[in-house]
Amino acid sequence: MVKMTKSKTFQAYLPHCHRTYSCIHCRAHLANHDELISKSFQGSQGRAYLFNSVVNVGCGPAEERVLLTGLHAVADIYCENCKTTLGWKYEHAFESSQKYKEGKFIIELAHMIKDNGW
């Protein structure tokens, strides 16, 4: 008897010629380097990067949290493949100086690696 196992499939593959960031746990692509906005963010487990857009990421329900820069409505994001929580999405910023974060994504360095062309 042959045991069949389900292979891992990803929703999106980023082009191999680009520098990409991947989930450290399962290697699913998460973001293209061109989508990186800032490396100067702090996550709940250390340093984090702010991205304009991401792939292969699911989003939980939004909730209000007081972060280092004030009150925000954020939703936890997780890897669609391995379900590891990666960071969060900024849904709403209550401070006018923080509005640029709305719709953007935080991924903690503890959960991603650099792939392709580094």
UniProtKB/Swiss-Prot annotation:
Keywords, alphabetical: Metal-binding, Nucleus, Zinc
Entry-linked InterPro entries: Yippee (IPR034751), Yippee/Mis18/Cereblon (IPR004910), Yippee_fam (IPR039058)
Any single Gene Ontology cellular-component annotation: nucleus
Keyword Signal part of the UniProt annotation: no
Entries under Pfam families matching the protein: Yippee-Mis18 (PF03226)
Molecular functions per Gene Ontology: metal ion binding
Motif (Nuclear localization signal): 99-104
Cellular localisation: Nucleus
Positions bound to Zn(2+): C23, C26, C79, C82
Translocase among keywords: no
All copies of domain Yippee, residue ranges: 19-116
Function: May play a role in epithelioid conversion of fibroblasts.
Family: Belongs to the yippee family.
Protein name: Protein yippee-like 1
Organism of this sequence: Mus musculus
Lineage, uppermost ranks: Eukaryota, Metazoa, Chordata, Craniata, Vertebrata
